[in-house]
Structure formats: C-alpha cells, structure tokens
C-alpha cells in the first residue's frame, strides 16, 4: 500500500502527511521512494508509535518507549523524527500521554476532522462515496496505508480533489 501511495504522490505531486508505525516493514521497504519526497517537504512524516497500541491502556514508560522507538526509526530511516506531530493510535490519549509525548518533542497531538473509513474493510465504491462526503476545504482527512481498496481508486480520489479546486497539503504547510 505504501508503495502505491508513494507512486501516487510522485505522479500527481500530492502533498500529505503520513503518520508512521515503524513496526510495519512497508515503511522501510519503501524508504528509497519516499525519502526524496520527505527531504523536499512534499511528504511529511509524523509519529504514530512503534506498534500502534492503545496508549491509554499501557504504562507511561511504555508510551514513552513506543514514541521514542518510532522517532528513532524515523530518524534512522528518513532523517526526520516527526516532531512536533504525534497521532495517538485510535485517537485515544490523555493529559498524561500528551505530557509524555511533549516531553519527547511531540507537542502537537494531531487528530482528524474527517475519516474516509478505509481501515474498516470497505470496498472501493464505498471509499469513493466517503471521499465525496469528506473531501472538503480545511479538513484533516484520515486515511490508511494498510488495505488495498485505497490503492485501486487513487485516480478517483485525485479527481474529487481536483474537481473541487482543493489542494493537498502537509501539516507543516498549514502550521509552520
């Protein structure tokens, strides 16, 4: 999935932010394709923990380890650590987990305002219908790089973006 999304970004000049779990080997396997886009700023990487646990159900030391380990992975693999952006798995976080993240440099807990639902095993038609509803101005749209349907309708997603006069941006484009 990461390979297809990287190719889409290359082919269409799409700008976006990926929140990475380093345990998924696709991020290592596709680093040669993604690294130039990360270096140029076309693609931004944020920290999404090493292995995607519900951080509200593990101890704070384990939360720190998850964030630190993933930051180390990002730094070693891509030359960036994802700071200041952290997206807690499942969107679940507490004031304590936010403090742990902030202590490690991740001061921007980043959630989303719209979700295309691609992580729930929907088919391509449902995904495109969801994109029709959620691709609106000034939205942070949640999508995933782990199930095939999204890779089969990237051109349709581009068409929705372009037909509405929207443009994709990274978080740094907006908040820097």
Task: For the regions a language model picked out, list residue spans one by one.
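Solvent-exposed, polar/charged alpha-helical surfaces in well-ordered, non-transmembrane soluble domains
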Residues: 3, 7, 32, 61, ...
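Acidic-and-aromatic substrate-binding clefts and catalytic sites of carbohydrate-active enzymes
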Residues: 1, 20-30, 54-58, 87-93, ...
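Basic- and aromatic-lined ligand-binding clefts that recognize polyanionic substrates
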Residues: 76-92, 98-104, 148
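Structural recognition of the beta-strand scaffold that forms the well-ordered cores
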Residues: 16-20, 44-47, 84-88, 108-112, ...
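Periplasmic-binding protein-like
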Residues: 137-139, 147-150
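Active-site beta->alpha N-cap acidic-glycine motif
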Residues: 1-54, 60-62, 66, 71-76, ...
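His/Asp/Glu-enriched short active-site or ligand-binding loop at hydrolase and phosphoryl-transfer sites
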Residues: 92-134, 166-176
């Amino acid at each position: 999935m990461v390979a297809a999304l990287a190719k889409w970004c290359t082919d269409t000049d799409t700008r976006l932010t990926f929140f990475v779990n380093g345990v998924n080997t696709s991020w290592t396997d596709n680093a040669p394709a993604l690294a130039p886009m990360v270096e140029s700023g076309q693609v931004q990487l944020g920290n999404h923990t090493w292995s995607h646990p519900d951080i509200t159900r593990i101890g704070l030391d384990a939360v720190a380890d998850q964030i630190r380990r993933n930051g180390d992975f990002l730094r070693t693999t891509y030359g960036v650590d994802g700071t200041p952006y952290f997206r807690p798995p499942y969107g679940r976080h507490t004031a304590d987990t936010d403090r742990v993240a902030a202590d490690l440099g991740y001061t921007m807990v980043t959630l989303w305002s719209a979700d295309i639902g691609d992580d729930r095993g929907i088919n391509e038609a449902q995904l495109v219908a969801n994109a029709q509803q959620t691709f609106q101005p000034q939205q942070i749209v949640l999508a995933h790089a782990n199930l095939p349907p999204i890779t089969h309708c990237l051109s349709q997603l581009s068409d929705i973006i372009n037909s509405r006069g929207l443009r994709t941006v990274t978080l740094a484009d907006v908040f820097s």
